[in-house]
């Protein structure tokens, strides 16, 4: 009890309040013992931390050094300019431009002959079409001319036949009216008298004999000739 009561003396309150004082460390009360044990544990734990601190510091230092090295390498890699690809080379661009210009000129030259050939074909086709049309027109003209000539020749033949028939009819009429032989168109004489047939047609005697050697029909009407001899 004396040691417990001695912990609560008023004059030693400052020493008991200071944990680093000898009175505080040598106090046999439970509160002071627990506090001293806690302080001892904290001091031991701090020593372990201080001993383990260099390894962690080394690890952090190695990490920082490696990170700084990586940063340096990345900065160096970034700082060094990347080489231009072959596509970005101005000489390559110039060569590409020249090639494209050559290709475009070559294609233009190829298109020009094609156009000229197509124009020539169209012109030749147009000329050929014109010639064909002209030939067709000339053929149609020839056909029309031939048709017209054939029609005109038929008309001429018909007109001639009509005129011949008219002339023969007129001849028969004249022969009957003028009393001449229809075969020789000569007058009757005593030496060559007139012979009249039953079909009422008259001829020279010599003419009718010559006719009868070839046919027995009347040369005018085509009937069989029968004679009526007149003195």
Swiss-Prot record:
User: Which residues lie within the region annotated Disordered?
Assistant: 103-125
Q: Which SUPFAM superfamilies does the record cross-reference, listed alphabetically?
A: RING/U-box
According to its UniProt entry, the protein's GO biological process terms are:
protein ubiquitination
- GO MF terms held by the record: transferase activity; zinc ion binding
* Domain of life where this protein originates: Eukaryota
**Localisation per UniProt entry:** Cytoplasm
Please indicate if the UniProt record lists Iron as a keyword: no
Q: What is its EC number?
A: 2.3.2.27
Q: Where are the zinc fingers (RING-type)?
A: 181-222
Please name the InterPro entries in this protein's record: Znf_RING, Znf_RING/FYVE/PHD
Keywords of the record: Cytoplasm, Metal-binding, Transferase, Ubl conjugation pathway, Zinc, Zinc-finger
- Cite the annotated pathway: Protein modification; protein ubiquitination
Database matches in Pfam families: zf-RING_2 (PF13639)
| Residues forming coiled coils | none
An example GO CC term for this entry is:
cytoplasm
Mark out the compositionally biased spans (Basic and acidic residues).
Answer: 103-118
What's the catalysed reaction?
Answer: S-ubiquitinyl-[E2 ubiquitin-conjugating enzyme]-L-cysteine + [acceptor protein]-L-lysine = [E2 ubiquitin-conjugating enzyme]-L-cysteine + N(6)-ubiquitinyl-[acceptor protein]-L-lysine
The principal location of this protein is: cytoplasm
Tell me, what does this protein do in biology? Mediates E2-dependent protein ubiquitination.
Comment field on protein domains: The RING-type zinc finger domain mediates binding to an E2 ubiquitin-conjugating enzyme.
- The protein's name: E3 ubiquitin-protein ligase At3g02290
């Amino acid at each position: 009890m004396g040691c417990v009561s001695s912990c609560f003396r008023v004059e030693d309150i400052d020493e008991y309040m200071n944990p680093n004082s000898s009175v505080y460390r040598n106090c046999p009360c439970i509160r002071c013992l627990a506090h001293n044990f806690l302080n001892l544990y904290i001091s031991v734990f701090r020593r372990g931390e201080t001993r383990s601190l260099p390894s962690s510091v080394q690890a952090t230092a190695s990490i920082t050094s490696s990170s700084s090295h990586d940063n340096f390498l990345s900065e160096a890699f970034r700082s060094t300019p990347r080489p231009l690809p072959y596509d970005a080379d101005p000489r390559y661009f110039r060569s590409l431009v020249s090639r494209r210009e050559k290709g475009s000129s070559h294609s233009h030259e190829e298109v020009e002959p094609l156009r000229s050939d197509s124009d020539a074909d169209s012109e030749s086709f147009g000329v050929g079409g014109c010639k064909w049309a002209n030939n067709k027109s000339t053929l149609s003209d020839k056909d029309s001319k031939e048709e017209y000539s054939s029609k005109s020749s038929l008309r001429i033949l018909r007109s001639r036949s009509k005129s011949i028939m008219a002339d023969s009819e007129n001849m028969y009429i004249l022969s009957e009216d003028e009393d001449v032989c229809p075969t020789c168109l000569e007058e009757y004489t005593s030496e060559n008298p007139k012979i009249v047939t039953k079909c009422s047609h008259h001829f020279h005697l010599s003419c009718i004999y010559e006719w009868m050697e070839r046919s027995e029909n009347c040369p005018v009407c085509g009937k069989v000739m029968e004679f009526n001899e007149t003195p």
